[in-house]
Amino acid sequence: MTQIPPSRLHSPLDRLLVEAQRALDTVFGNPPAERPNPAGDTPDAALAPAQRQHAAGLMRINHVGEVCAQGLYFGQAAVARDDHTRQHLLTAAQEETDHLAWCADRLRELESRPSLFNPLWYAGSYALGAVAGLRGDDWSLGFVVETERQVEAHLDEHLETLPETDQRSRAILRVMKIDEARHADHAEQAGARILPPPIPSAMALASKLMKTIAYRF
């Protein structure tokens, strides 16, 4: 992910260029992971065509989830009022960059591709993050908690439905699940607001729509 020195982040144009570069890196680039791929030397077992297609669909969903997480966190960080909250969000975003890279690697191994709608997923998530952040840092952190808890739940579902022999995908998802739980815990400790009931339900509905589309496209 392209880094721009803090000393340059003075003008609105500087900040706009930073956000544009982040969007391009996330959606069209191939940002490198800072940590090793959890799949490591795990053997890539042979999968039947239907199994490979299913595994690719699930990993495409997970890749989209990371695109959305990047958009959400960068949108929140752009309007965060507290430096500690901003740094918390950017640190979480860096770990999500690792997830993004790992999922992209696995999609290539499965001879598949990311979602065609990644620009839309990113833009929508960035807008949601900015709106949440404008309500206040406690609201912003509340969205982090709810997002990560919902991601944990769908990672559990994927670990149950992935082909048993697809140990490379499983290794990646297990580490992602640990990271997501930690992000949620840290956000709670930082003062996250509990979101009112309609919001988590709306987020779950949007997530279901995204997963349905991303599985195939």
Swiss-Prot record:
GO terms for cellular component: plasma membrane. Fe cation 1 binds at residues 66, 96, 99, 180. Belongs to the COQ7 family. Pathway: Cofactor biosynthesis; ubiquinone biosynthesis. Its EC number is 1.14.99.60. Catalyzes the hydroxylation of 2-nonaprenyl-3-methyl-6-methoxy-1,4-benzoquinol during ubiquinone biosynthesis. Fe cation 2 binds at residues 96, 148, 180, 183. GO terms for molecular function: 3-demethoxyubiquinol 3-hydroxylase activity; metal ion binding. It is a peripheral membrane protein. PANTHER family: 5-DEMETHOXYUBIQUINONE HYDROXYLASE, MITOCHONDRIAL, COENZYME Q10 BIOSYNTHESIS PROTEIN 7. HAMAP family: COQ7. It comes from Xanthomonas campestris pv. campestris (strain ATCC 33913 / DSM 3586 / NCPPB 528 / LMG 568 / P 25). Its cofactor is Fe cation. The keyword Cell membrane applies. The lineage of its organism: Bacteria, Pseudomonadati, Pseudomonadota, Gammaproteobacteria, Lysobacterales. It catalyses: a 5-methoxy-2-methyl-3-(all-trans-polyprenyl)benzene-1,4-diol + AH2 + O2 = a 3-demethylubiquinol + A + H2O. Its main location: membrane. InterPro entries: COQ7_proteobact (IPR047809), Ferritin-like (IPR012347), Ferritin-like_SF (IPR009078), Ubq_synth_Coq7 (IPR011566). One of its GO terms (biological process) is ubiquinone biosynthetic process. It is found in: Cell membrane. This is 3-demethoxyubiquinol 3-hydroxylase.
